[in-house]
Amino acid sequence: NRQLTEKGLKVEKASAAVVDATIIQTAGSKQRQAIEVDEEGQVSGQTTPSKDSDARWIKKNGLYKLGYKQHTRTDAEGYIEKLHITPANAHECKHLSPLLEGIAEGTTVYADKGYDSAENRQHLKEHQLLDGIMRKACRNRPLTEAQTKRNRYLSKTRYVVEQSFGTLHRKFRYARAAYFGLIKVSAQSHLKAMCLNLLKAANRLSA
């Protein structure tokens, strides 16, 4: 990223940080016998044993997936600036602060409702970062009209990180890892992020 900045292909100090997470399925064949997943990300019931002891199960869009979660921060243009990998059952709400290391004071942090917590908002305040986290409705406490409008506005900015995930999954075929183990999957994620950033820079040059 430093070299892209020096070449004028990426802004040096972005005014926005966009945070989200995506699932990277474990390497190998699909497992189809999963029925229930407990709070620890383990399957309740009989399944084919996994070769990847670091991977965990998660239910996403009605489907059970075994793998990892890539927690990611991009700038406003979709360049990946920071990421880290956890088992898939890790909740993104607890993994916001590591993604914000090194960003400048006054930066607006955009994130979806999965990051809505008092702790995360306090972290932004303590580090003089602007709050762009979408609000989550609670039981017996629906969102106000103003909060709903704010969420709609914030979602228009968050699309850049979703576009980056789409490119990783389609262009770089990274919906599934090529290796077993958290360390190797983390290394692969960082290499894919470098490829994504170089592709975005190349597209900018040819535009």
Task: Please identify what each model-predicted range represents.
Residues 1-127, 195:
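Polybasic low-complexity intrinsically disordered regions
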Residues 94, 119, 139-147:
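Short, charged, surface-exposed secondary-structure boundary motifs
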